[in-house]
Each structure stands twice: as structure tokens, then as C-alpha cells.
């Protein structure tokens, strides 16, 4: 919690002190498409049966079936790394709230709501695609191949219900989508190359640390983590680009007790 607070304070200081560009984002038809795709993938994932890993499944696992690139993950297991990955993910996930708060202070609700809406779309799409892929692929997590853990220990871990959700890494995907969203939107909103470099380095560093910790925890193979990083990066970069004002069709107007969303025909 302390590290999260320090990161946000650092970001807030530089946001309030930096020169701001014209706000370039708006709601448009892409907002509808992104929300629909994210929502539909999430609903589709909920319709699929939860993948179950039984003690018989665990006993039948053979590490020799794992490719050499991924095999080292079957020797990893660390509850501490698992917990730490939640912390690093949490820090990078909440960081965009500093920019939303800055927009609220500078320009009022309209810009803050648009920025927050873009971030929610990013999370919805990242999470929906991830959940659907996990339920379709049903790859067993590497820790269940780990012979240093007894069959009983692995059976207890499998009882949590996520033993076959290895591909791909959701923590890594969300961390990278949040990190790239944060840094790329900062570049559009502020003219400060020094802070930009620091922000890219720190946010991508946290996302990379999240992926590494998922590996050390025995939760994911390297290919799971690499895939999550690529997909998260793509979504985190593309969603805000899809909201640049050149494609403006929607306007969100806050009222005293309401919000009005208007569509403009071209």
C-alpha cells in the first residue's frame, strides 16, 4: 500500500506541474464496439463450464510433454511471489486514476469521465478476451507438474478451481494494458519527455515484474506470460487511439443530476 501511495503521489506532482495539451479524446462509435466485444467475450466465458483439474488428471501429468522453452516453469512454486504479483498489478492498475483526477481538477467532469470510460473499456476488453481464452484452451498451470509438491498438496491447490487456466496470464495482460494505457495517454496529454520516459520505464517495469512473479509462483509458463504481455500491450495502446477526436461521434455532457450521451450524425 505504501509503494502504491508513493507512486501515485509522484505521478500526481508531475501531472499538476506539467504543461497540458488540448484534451484529444472523445466517445465515438469505437466506444460502443469495444464495450460490446468486451462484454460479449465476458458473457461467452461465463457460459462455458469451469475447467476442472482432478487428482487423476494431476497424477497423469508428464513434464516431458512440456516444450523446452516452458519447462523450467514446472520447477517453480512460491506463495510469496503469488502475493507480490497481486501488489505489483494493483499499483499499475490504479495509476491511471491519477490522470483522471488531474483531468477532473483541470477541466471538470467531462474529460475525467471520458478518460475513466476509456480505461474501463480497456479493462473490460482485456479481461473478457483473457477469460474466454482461458476457458477455451484449459491449459494446466505449471505448478501441478512440480514433483517437489506431493500429489495431495497439488490436489489441495487444484481445489481452488483455477488449475487449468494457465493460458494466458491474466495478471500480465491486465498489467501491460494498464501500463501502456497510462504511459501512452500521458504522452497525448502532457509535454514532458523526462516524466514520459520515467513513466514508461516504471509502468512497464511493474508490468514485467508482475509477469516474472507469476512465473516464480508457478502460475504460468513463459509462453503464457509473453502472450499476455503482447495482448495487453496491444489493447492498452489501441483503445485510447480509437478515441482520438478525429473519429468523434459521441459527446458526454454532465448535468446537475444526470449525464447526457449524444450521437452526432456526420
Predicted features along the sequence, with ranges:
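Generic beta-strand or strand-like secondary-structure segments
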Residues: 93-100, 115, 128, 132
Amino acid at each position: 500500500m505504501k509503494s502504491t501511495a508513493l507512486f501515485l503521489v509522484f505521478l500526481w506532482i508531475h501531472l499538476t506541474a506539467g504543461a497540458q495539451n488540448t484534451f484529444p479524446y472523445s466517445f465515438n462509435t469505437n466506444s460502443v464496439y469495444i464495450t460490446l466485444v468486451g462484454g460479449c467475450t465476458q458473457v461467452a466465458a461465463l457460459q462455458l463450464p469451469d475447467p476442472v483439474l482432478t487428482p487423476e488428471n494431476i497424477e497423469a501429468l508428464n513434464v516431458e510433454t512440456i516444450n523446452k522453452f516452458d519447462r523450467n516453469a514446472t520447477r517453480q512454486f512460491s506463495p510469496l511471489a503469488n502475493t507480490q504479483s497481486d501488489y505489483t498489478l494493483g499499483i499499475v492498475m490504479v495509476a491511471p486514476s491519477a490522470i483522471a483526477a488531474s483531468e477532473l481538477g483541470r477541466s471538470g467532469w467531462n474529460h475525467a469521465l471520458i478518460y475513466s470510460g476509456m480505461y474501463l473499456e480497456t479493462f473490460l476488453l482485456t479481461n473478457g478476451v483473457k477469460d474466454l481464452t482461458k476457458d477455451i484452451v484449459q491449459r494446466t498451470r505449471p505448478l501441478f507438474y512440480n514433483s517437489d509438491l506431493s500429489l495431495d498438496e497439488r490436489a489441495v491447490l487444484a481445489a481452488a478451481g483455477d488449475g487449468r487456466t494457465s493460458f494466458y496470464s491474466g495478471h500480465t495482460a491486465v498489467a501491460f494494458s494498464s501500463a501502456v494505457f497510462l504511459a501512452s495517454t500521458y504522452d497525448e496529454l502532457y509535454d514532458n519527455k523526462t516524466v514520459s520516459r520515467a513513466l514508461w520505464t516504471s509502468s512497464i517495469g511493474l508490468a514485467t515484474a508482475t509477469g516474472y512473479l507469476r512465473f516464480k509462483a508457478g502460475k504460468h509458463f513463459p509462453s503464457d506470460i509473453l502472450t499476455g504481455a503482447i495482448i495487453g500491450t496491444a489493447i492498452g495502446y489501441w483503445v485510447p487511439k480509437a478515441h482520438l477526436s478525429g473519429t468523434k461521434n459521441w459527446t458526454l455532457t454532465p448535468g446537475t443530476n444526470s449525464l447526457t450521451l449524444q450521437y452526432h450524425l456526420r
